[in-house]
Amino acid sequence: IKKKNSPTILKRRFLDVSNKNKVLGVYKINDEILTKAQDKIFCNFLKNMVPKYDLVIVTDYGHGLISKNGANLICKLSKYLALNAQVNAANIGYHSMRNYKNIDSVIINANEIRHEMRNRNDSIESLMRKLSLQQNIKDLIVTRGTLGSVLYNKKNNKINYCGAYAKVAVDKIGAGDAMLSIIAL
C-alpha cells in the first residue's frame, strides 16, 4: 500500500537522564486512516495471509493502518491472536482496542487498561475482568513496571501475579513490545 505524504516515521524521545523516563515525545507521522481503496487492498491482503499462520501478533499503535474492518478480519481469521494496542503520546485520547474481539492473548500496561476502561480508581484486577468479558479475551496481562505483571485467565477466572526481576527500570521504552513477543509464544 502506498500512502501519499507518508515519509518514514520519525520519533524523537527526550529522556530524563537520571531516571530514563520519557519527558517529551515529538512524532512526525502521517496517521490519517487509509482511503477506502487502500483499506480494501489491505483487507484482501489480510484475508490471504492471516489464515496461513498459527500465531498472529498484532501491535496496533493507532496510526491509521488497521481499520475496524481490518481488525474484524484479523480476529475472525486468526488461529491464535496476540494483541498489543498501545496508547502513546501520538494517539492518546482516541485510540482504543474496541475493534478487537475474541482475542487469545492481550498485553497492555496499567495506564493503558485504565485509559481503555476510562477508569482511574478501580483495581487493576477488576478492570481486567471487565475488559476480558467486554472483548472476550482469554488471557490478559497487565504490566506494572517494577511492580511486575498481573495475569488474568478468563476461563478459570484466575488472577496470577508475576514479580519484576528488576527493581529499578533502566530502559522501559520498548519493554511492552519485548514482553508481547515472549508471552505470545
What are the residue ranges of the model-derived segments?
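Short gly/pro/ser/thr-enriched loop/turn and capping motifs at secondary-structure boundaries
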Residues: 6-9, 88-91, 113-115
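Non-cysteine beta-strand/loop elements that form the S-adenosyl-L-methionine
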Residues: 15, 102-111
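Well-ordered alpha-helical segments embedded in enzymatic catalytic cores
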Residues: 41-45, 112, 127
